[in-house]
Amino acid sequence: MVKILGVKYFLHDSGVFYIDTKNKEIFGILTERVTRIKHDGGTVIPILNEYPKLKNIDYVAYPFEQTNLDFILFKHIDDYIKRTYKPKYIKEYAKYKKELSQNKTKFVLNNIYRPFIWEILAVYGLRKLLFKRFNNIYNKLGNLAIKRELKKIFRKDVSLYEHHLCHAASAYYFSPFFPKETLVFTLDGIGDWKYHSLWLFKEYDYRLVSYSSFDIICYDDVEGIFKGASIGHIYSLFTEILGFTPNSDEGKTEALAAYGKPNGELYNLLKKGYKINKEKLRWEHDINILKKLHNKQYLQKWKEKIGDENFAATIQRWLEDTVVEYLNIVYEKFKIQRLAMAGGVVANVIMNLNIFERTPFEELYIFPAMGDDGVAAGAAILKAVELGEDISWLKDLEMPYWGPNYSREDVEKELKKDKWKDKITYEYIGEKWPEIAAEMIAKGNIIAVYQGKMEFGPRALGNRSILADPRDPKTRDKINSTVKRRPWFQPFCPSVLEEERERLFEKSYKHKHMAIAFRMKKEFWDKLPSAMHIDGTARPQFVEEKDNPNYYRLLKKFKEITGYGIVINTSFNLHGRTIVRTPEDAITDFIDCNIDAMFIEGYLVKRKI
């Protein structure tokens, strides 16, 4: 019986995942929720300062086998930005990081007397040479660096696990399929020099079936990075060319794609660049074509030629088609009905819809924290399996309410602080809040809900949510423009009573995590216009009473009033900020955005006029 901490630290989405096998307890949180810098990849020390219990562990597990020396560059630049500029949110952080990347001399000169600067100078000078000629040395030195860093923090030896295996383990052991034989598919940008893997899991045994390599295309002297073949990276590159933030705004590319049509010539280039080897079950690459496709000037010309919407539609359609083609080949080989999935690309809900509709798999599971936010969970699980621990109980934890919670007393203490007295009013309404909230939504109000444990993963599922009426066609534009302050074309997702699923949607299944889209029946398009995208799809959370009793009551009351057990549900945060964690976060974001009321652990909060 042991306590294990999975730790993701480096590049983006750092965080921890705690498993206590004796008490059957888990806890997961990302660094971004503490620092409020979205996709924060820095040290997990801010988490440990907030939750010191996480230091009381037996083992530490890390979700990479190969962490190269770039870790040193990232760590010190990240520390420097946070120490020097103290950025509040991701926009400020990204601004300073861009400045430093364009002026490395400034960074070096400002830190010349600090002991770590000699590490920086050594890596800057040797990274290209080491990487090209002595890649193994570059990776081994990186592994030593990350182990040294984590051992300094936790005073424990660190176990390293292959990145895609960590994705796969999280998807299988939290799925309802355990202990049955299951195919597990992962797809992301890069992890341990792969971007895709296919596994066979059965109980505590697993084997790697195939993987696709991150084949090096070229070295970018301007950005100081190696570019490689990767389905996730090419999608992120299209996202960047569209003017969005790569590794963050891919959902915007996906949303914009619904307004365009794929360009045949560009689509065919992508198809020729990434070819499926049917025997080896992997993607292989035409490097000459990929050199073109990874040239930003070349892609910029394509975008200008065909327009933003068609540019987005091309990469989206190609993604859907190539993944569906691959998985159909996999199914024909194995004839296994169960498919579990994880990896950053698996956040693409329209791709997942295509897998559901266009492949023969009968059972599909997508891990709620499908991106690198979830690999800490996979690493902790793999350590438990290695130690022979029973983790069969994980599959019973359907809803990812695995983060911190704050009591009514904590909330009351925060509400009473002097800094809020001129900004908000509040009253305690107790357990009747779900019904009052439903009544307010039905009258056209936009409300926020803060209750219970915070969600683990990118989706708010009723505990840190902003809710609104899907019947009003103006709801989406209102939230986009005055509440979330996002682009006009981004859709919002609905939370739906499970008993309403077959009434409102075409072919679907009991999915609870907003990780796949389904098609709304056409007779409801004009009745629930803000619950779906322009193409008639919606990314729903189907809610049962056992999942979240208070949220279920809210939906039931809304159906009683309106005839529809469905509300718009978007995460409780402003655009560019992270989902709120503490009562202080909740009050701050409530004041800063145009929400009519907030329900927080039995309190009804409103802004002073």
From Swiss-Prot:
The cross-references to InterPro entries, in alphabetical order and at most eight, read: ATPase_NBD, Carbam_trans_C, Carbam_trans_C_sf, Carbtransf_dom, NodU/CmcH_Carbamoyltrnsfr
Database matches in PANTHER family = NODULATION PROTEIN U (PTHR34847:SF1)
User: What protein name is recorded for this chain?
Assistant: Uncharacterized protein MJ1058
One annotated GO biological process: biosynthetic process
Pfam families given for it? Carbam_trans_C, Carbam_trans_N
Alphabetized GO MF terms: transferase activity
Please give the family membership noted in the entry.
Belongs to the NodU/CmcH family.
Q: What is the lineage of its organism?
A: Archaea, Methanobacteriati, Methanobacteriota, Methanomada group, Methanococci
Protein species of origin: Methanocaldococcus jannaschii (strain ATCC 43067 / DSM 2661 / JAL-1 / JCM 10045 / NBRC 100440) (Methanococcus jannaschii)
Q: Which CDD domains does the protein's record reference?
A: ASKHA_NBD_MJ1051-like_N (cd24100)
Keywords tagged on the record: Transferase
